[in-house]
């Protein structure tokens, strides 16, 4: 999907609510430094100072809209950033612009970091000739999931399930609590009815076969070494060709190619969100008529 179109997935009311909550966290009461900056109309340039993929424009727009500022973008969503890049210009009252600055930078840096990591993983997987799905996981930052899931999409990865209601995933603890794979899957199948797919985490071929026999749509082969993963997936697919196979656990960028194979449909990586470094952005005010520069001028 075109990264520019992904913004339409984000409900405006949700964007506004998130922006409001982040701003309230940063300034729940008196903003003393507003007396320093004043209220004069001001302008600032958003600079990208590290390479990567630009992601998070809708969130930055929502943050600055909450503080009565306007954003003009110079680069589209999903752009490859080559530092130092002039990304956007923000205009508004000085105290409002600076009130939104840190929240906006944090959000854009995090979202772009996830998108950059996702893009690297997708490129690595495609380099092997594998055509399956590179996906994230539910290992996201509490309160920041929408930003991180959106970043995955901009980077070209699949978001996987957004929450517990998006897919019935039966994990090892569910199997333990239910008293076995078949009991757990049958209960999940009844709960899912026709509307949701059921995925089952399995640690052996026997569990995978039991899950498929009980009606699982997807089987997650968790923490399999590559030399075990591919024969297991091949055997399972031979018996149950309609069951999708996901590989997860211990997958990193450096070993991702080892997990790509003809019987693997999805490879999910928690590190896409857990290990993604934030990109470096800065916001610098400049005087009307002056040439913006990516560093503060000192007189």
UniProtKB/Swiss-Prot annotation:
Region named Important for hexamer formation: 8-12
Taxon lineage: Eukaryota, Metazoa, Chordata, Craniata, Vertebrata
Oligomeric form and interacting partners: Hexamer formed by 3 homodimers.
Catalytic activity of the protein: nicotinate beta-D-ribonucleotide + CO2 + diphosphate = quinolinate + 5-phospho-alpha-D-ribose 1-diphosphate + 2 H(+)
Family classification: Belongs to the NadC/ModD family.
UniProt-recorded Gene Ontology molecular function terms: nicotinate-nucleotide diphosphorylase (carboxylating) activity
Function: Involved in the catabolism of quinolinic acid (QA).
Alphabetized UniProt keyword annotations: Glycosyltransferase, Phosphoprotein, Pyridine nucleotide biosynthesis, Transferase
GO cellular component, one term: cytoplasm
Protein name as annotated: Nicotinate-nucleotide pyrophosphorylase [carboxylating]
GO BP annotation list: NAD biosynthetic process; quinolinate catabolic process
Pathway info: Cofactor biosynthesis; NAD(+) biosynthesis; nicotinate D-ribonucleotide from quinolinate: step 1/1
Keyword Phosphoprotein found: yes
Residues annotated as binding quinolinate: 102, 138-139, 160-161, 171, 201, 222, 248-250, 270
Pfam family, one: QRPTase_C
Modified residues (Phosphothreonine): 291
Keyword Transferase: yes
EC code: 2.4.2.19
